[in-house]
Amino acid sequence: MNKNDSRLRRARQTRLKIAELNVARLAVHRTNLHIYAQVFSEDGTKVLASASTAEAEVRKELNGNGGNTAAATLVGKRIAEKAKAAGIEAVAFDRSGFRYHGRVKALADAAREAGLKF
């Protein structure tokens, strides 16, 4: 089992546990160049809000690339604002098998500071 398979296995386990909670899910995906965040509905069928460093508005505010903690902080603030605008106050945090460290942690902390509860 390689590194990616292990990450996907962890992600599957997390998503099964979150599905039992029946709450909205904040999913994070990380690549070398970008970070993506999506808020899914309680049943997991609809994307209620999304934000990423690939968006034009975010790229204007970034002075470097989208693969750093400053960019993740900006995406965390934007996803919290969009989720609150969609009427979502509390979510379950789905780190998609990534370690809660660095960019993933920066995004989560920024979303919490912007008023999203998880």
UniProtKB/Swiss-Prot annotation:
Top-rank lineage group of the source organism: Bacteria
A single GO cellular-component term on record: cytosolic large ribosomal subunit
GO biological process: translation
Family annotation (InterPro entries): Ribosomal_uL18_bac-type (IPR004389), Ribosomal_uL18_bac/euk (IPR005484)
SUPFAM superfamilies on file: Translational machinery components (SSF53137)
Keywords linked to the UniProt accession: Ribonucleoprotein, Ribosomal protein, RNA-binding, rRNA-binding
Gene Ontology MF: a single term: structural constituent of ribosome
Keyword check for Ribonucleoprotein: yes
Quaternary context: Part of the 50S ribosomal subunit; part of the 5S rRNA/L5/L18/L25 subcomplex. Contacts the 5S and 23S rRNAs.
Matching NCBIfam families: L18_bact
Family (UniProt): Belongs to the universal ribosomal protein uL18 family.
Function field: This is one of the proteins that bind and probably mediate the attachment of the 5S RNA into the large ribosomal subunit, where it forms part of the central protuberance.
Protein name: Large ribosomal subunit protein uL18
Organism: Ralstonia nicotianae (strain ATCC BAA-1114 / GMI1000)
